[in-house]
């Protein structure tokens, strides 16, 4: 058994986060979960919108247009390792907090800019949200049922998949490079860039059952009978993802599916008919019975669990995917580290106290 350190792998990292929405706070949450000390610059009077995503911050209410506020922020950033901001391009420059100014004062600063469209390009100054950003990458066009409008996939794909995850990776890469050069740099983390990168698998596939330009028609897009969701007798739902022949065979055997489904699994001409037959089969039993038959096997099966019930699923409980902290259920820090695990910490100090300590070398 590895001996656990007191804090996560980013212990000692000093981060200044400017209040924002969506992916920016998620970046700071991930860094804080893994041990970074995060001072959050907030507008005076701000009330936390999401206590889970905004956890483990040392808050400072700052008027960025006042002399006092400017002095405080510049002092904080003189000692910080990382800055995270999500304003439109040019806002930080107009506040006197652009990269040229701050990197001159602190050449080791990693300056992370989290936006939808990026720092340049014809759409850089346009308003937008997750749905708009993924719309121009080709991702949204492929999500939904055949002959119907695209379905917004929450804001997982853009804000958090192509946004905060890539921004965090960029920050860590810049910190790693800083160990060699001694210099910080700007990380331009645009959601459109991240989502395009997420789509590399699809852009790289030839036109086939895996990649099609028709919505709802690909193997992974919901057309295949062995990779989709089905309704059960009680109205609850299940997911099946039995792509490989051996897993498909196990699904059919354990579910006691019609014999004819065993032939022609990968022939798209069969998919509509086979989908109807599996849909009828899954309607014969409630979800709990299908769970007893299929969960934990090689049938590639899982029940569709509502958001508010996810923490109670046996596997999620066994993994400790949710933790209780401060009287609230929180998502656990991820990923897991065997020697320096992340943890959810209290925000015991206010931001001004933390910056004062940084200024004194602490």
Language model region names:
Residues 36, 43, 64, 89, ...:
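Active-site loop/turn elements of alpha/beta-hydrolase fold enzymes
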Residues 2-6, 325-362:
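Flexible, small-/acidic-enriched active-site or ligand-binding loops
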Residues 34, 79, 297:
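Conserved dinucleotide-binding and phosphotransfer motif residues
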Residues 7-46:
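Conserved small-residue-rich beta-alpha loop and adjacent elements
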Residues 295-344:
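A glycine-rich dinucleotide-binding beta-alpha-beta segment and adjacent secondary-structure elements
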Residues 226-297, 301:
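Aromatic-enriched alpha-helical interface/lid elements that frame and gate functional surfaces
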């Amino acid at each position: 058994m590895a001996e656990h350190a007191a804090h996560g792998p980013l212990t000692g990292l000093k981060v200044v986060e400017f209040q924002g929405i969506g992916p920016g706070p998620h970046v700071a949450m991930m860094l804080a979960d893994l041990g970074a000390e995060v001072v959050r610059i907030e507008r005076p009077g701000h009330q936390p919108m999401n206590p889970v995503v905004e956890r483990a911050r040392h808050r400072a209410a700052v008027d960025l247009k006042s002399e006092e506020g400017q002095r405080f922020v510049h002092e904080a950033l003189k000692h910080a390792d990382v800055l995270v901001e999500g304003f439109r391009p040019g806002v930080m420059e107009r506040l006197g907090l652009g990269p040229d100014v701050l990197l001159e004062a602190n050449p080791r600063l990693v300056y992370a800019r989290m936006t939808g469209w990026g720092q340049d390009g014809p759409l850089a100054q346009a308003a937008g949200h997750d749905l708009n950003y993924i719309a121009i990458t080709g991702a949204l066009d492929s999500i939904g049922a055949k002959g119907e409008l695209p379905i917004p996939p929450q804001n997982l794909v853009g804000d958090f998949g192509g946004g905060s995850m890539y921004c965090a990776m960029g920050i860590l890469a810049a910190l790693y490079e800083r160990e060699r050069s001694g210099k910080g740099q700007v990380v331009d983390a645009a959601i459109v860039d991240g989502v395009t990168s997420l789509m590399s698998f699809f852009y790289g596939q030839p036109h086939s059952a895996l990649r099609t330009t028709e919505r709802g028609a690909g193997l992974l897009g919901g057309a295949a009978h062995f990779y989709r969701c089905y309704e059960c007798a009680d109205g609850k739902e299940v997911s099946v993802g039995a792509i490989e022949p051996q897993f498909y065979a196990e699904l059919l055997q354990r579910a006691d599916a019609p014999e004819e489904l065993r032939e022609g699994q990968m022939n798209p001409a069969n998919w509509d008919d086979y989908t109807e037959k599996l849909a009828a089969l899954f309607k014969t039993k409630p979800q709990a019975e299908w769970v007893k038959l299929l969960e934990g096997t090689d049938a590639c099966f899982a029940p569709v669990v509502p958001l508010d019930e996810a923490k109670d699923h046996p596997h999620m409980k066994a993994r400790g995917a949710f933790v209780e902290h401060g009287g609230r259920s929180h998502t656990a820090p991820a990923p897991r580290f065997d020697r320096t695990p992340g943890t959810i910490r209290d925000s015991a100090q206010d931001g001004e106290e933390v910056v004062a300590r940084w200024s004194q070398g602490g």
